[in-house]
Amino acid sequence: MQSPHIPVLLQEVLDAFDDFDSGDFLDCTLGYGGHSKALLQAHEKLRLIACDKDLEALNFSKEFLKKFQDRISFNHIGFKDILTQIPTQNLRGILADIGVSSLQLDKNDRGFSLNSDFLDMRMDQNNLLSAKEVVNSYSKEALEQIFKDYGDLAPVASMLTQKIINARSQKEITSAKELSQIIGNAKLKGRNVSLALLVFQALRIEVNNELGELKSLLENIEKAKLKDCKLAIISFHSLEDRIVKNTFKRWEKDCICDERAIKCECGKGHSLGKILSKKAISASKEEISYNSRSSCAKMRIFYFR
């Protein structure tokens, strides 16, 4: 059985956890099982806690990883909540791949791709909010803010929003294909990506509360007070990467006094561990050549002492 999704930064993930000895490993975003399968093969004493809010992906991976079923517990739950639901005392590794899988992007009825006949974009099909509702019911001001914040489209956000408002006043926008035609194929100056792709990114982030979920995951990881545990997070756009980078920096700080303070008053001793990736780890040219979607991937690693 073959996975329909190519896991990004696979070798880099294996390298990050090459010193894993034994204990529990949490894959916060199991998806179609590519990373987890490689880790299970590499580490015979690894016990996998696998979770995903996409039930379709979870059911696929149960079959895909059947060979290792006695070492896996499967959980249909979003990654932001998993740390509150599992024992953490034996947790030695955590991986979170905060991206949309190839299958989700390519599957017509999920409504992620520009040519889809649907306008959905929900990673969890139980969620009530879809891209169709956002596009057709959000106010002009709300849509404009989403495009500015999540699509980095400030120079053209007002113009793009007006196009959508004008179109939906004539008839409901019901497909991704229709929306991409409304937006058009133009590109921002100096950016090698279409406006439509950036609009779709912004809508997907809004529909799935992606930044909020990532922040909640990081908060729950911090509250878990992990010891001797390595965390690797793969993100796909600058907003996510910035959140991870800044959180890791804060976790590493020994002194938490205001930077303007003349001398330390906190007593130090607040560091949770160490950043193991001073710079974000990116895909190699070789990987990008056979998996173009890996070109945006960035991985950062933190070790909890």
From Swiss-Prot:
Q: Which reaction does it catalyse?
A: cytidine(1402) in 16S rRNA + S-adenosyl-L-methionine = N(4)-methylcytidine(1402) in 16S rRNA + S-adenosyl-L-homocysteine + H(+)
Where S-adenosyl-L-methionine is bound, by residue?
A: G33, G34, H35, D52, D97, Q104
GO CC, alphabetical: cytoplasm
* Entry keyword set: Cytoplasm, Methyltransferase, rRNA processing, S-adenosyl-L-methionine, Transferase
Identify which top EC class this enzyme belongs to: transferase
Q: Name one Pfam family in it.
A: Methyltransf_5
What does the record give as EC number? 2.1.1.199
* Annotated compartments: Cytoplasm
**Main localisation, per the record?**
cytoplasm
Alphabetized SUPFAM superfamilies for the sequence: Putative methyltransferase TM0872, insert domain, S-adenosyl-L-methionine-dependent methyltransferases
Q: Which domain of life is it from?
A: Bacteria
One function term, GO molecular function aspect: rRNA (cytosine-N4-)-methyltransferase activity
Gene Ontology biological-process annotations: rRNA base methylation
Q: Is the keyword RNA-binding in the record?
A: no
UniProt cross-references to PANTHER family, sorted A to Z:
12S RRNA N4-METHYLCYTIDINE METHYLTRANSFERASE (PTHR11265:SF0), S-ADENOSYL-METHYLTRANSFERASE MRAW (PTHR11265)
HAMAP family for the chain: 16SrRNA_methyltr_H
Q: Which family does it belong to?
A: Belongs to the methyltransferase superfamily. RsmH family.
Main role? Answer: Specifically methylates the N4 position of cytidine in position 1402 (C1402) of 16S rRNA.
| The protein's name in its UniProt record | Ribosomal RNA small subunit methyltransferase H
Phylogenetic lineage: Bacteria, Pseudomonadati, Campylobacterota, Epsilonproteobacteria, Campylobacterales
